[in-house]
Swiss-Prot record:
GO terms for cellular component: cytosol; membrane. PANTHER family: TRANSLATION INITIATION FACTOR IF-3 (PTHR10938), TRANSLATION INITIATION FACTOR IF-3, MITOCHONDRIAL (PTHR10938:SF0). This is Translation initiation factor IF-3. The keyword DNA repair does not apply. The gene is infC.
């Protein structure tokens, strides 16, 4: 069902057409009726007449409880927003000449981020003449990837960008 924004809907007295293709409360087609008759049917049922497709010829109007429709729509939207998960990218910065203890600390932080469901960008910044030894940086990134392979997949392989080498890891999606 296509949901229409409020500014696209015309309700009861806002409808300015001569005749409409009328759809009843339970979705049955009631045929093409003059607007006054459609309005009377809606009033008898104590509900609203809503123009849901003004571009059609003749325009389509539905008899419904607009307040309930709006409430259900907002409830669905809220439910959809709850289901959305916001994935953020966290960054772990390393050095090509990182010490073992520092590496373990950065690795622990990266694992925490991955376990929380965040993506991790692992970057190495080359300073001075270190840029001539890119293979050392690649080795550090490979070791980081190897030690997180049980909880992460490599989303973007190691690549150079100026004086920086980086790769991106993503948590392994749950198999349901």
């Amino acid at each position: 069902m296509r949901i229409i924004a409020k500014k696209d809907l015309f309700i009861n007295d806002e409808i300015r057409v001569r005749e409409v293709r009328l759809v009843g409360l339970d979705g049955e087609q009631m045929g093409i009726k003059p607007l006054s008759e459609a309005q009377a049917i809606a009033d008898d049922a104590n509900v609203d007449l809503v123009l849901i497709q003004p571009q059609a010829t003749p325009p389509v109007a539905k008899i419904m409880n607009y307040g309930k429709f709006k409430f259900e729509y907002q409830k669905k939207r809220k439910e959809q927003r709850k289901k959305q998960s916001v994935v953020t990218v966290k960054e772990v910065r390393l050095s090509p000449v990182i010490d073992k203890g520092d590496f373990e600390t950065k690795l622990r932080n990266g694992r925490k981020f991955l376990e929380k469901g965040n993506k991790v960008k692992v970057s190495i910044r080359f300073k001075g003449r270190m840029i001539t030894h890119k293979e050392i940086g690649a080795k550090v990134l490979a070791e980081f990837a190897e030690k997180t392979q049980d909880i992460a997949i490599i989303e973007q392989r190691a690549k150079m960008d100026g004086r920086q080498m980086f790769m991106q890891l993503a948590p392994i999606p749950d198999k349901k």
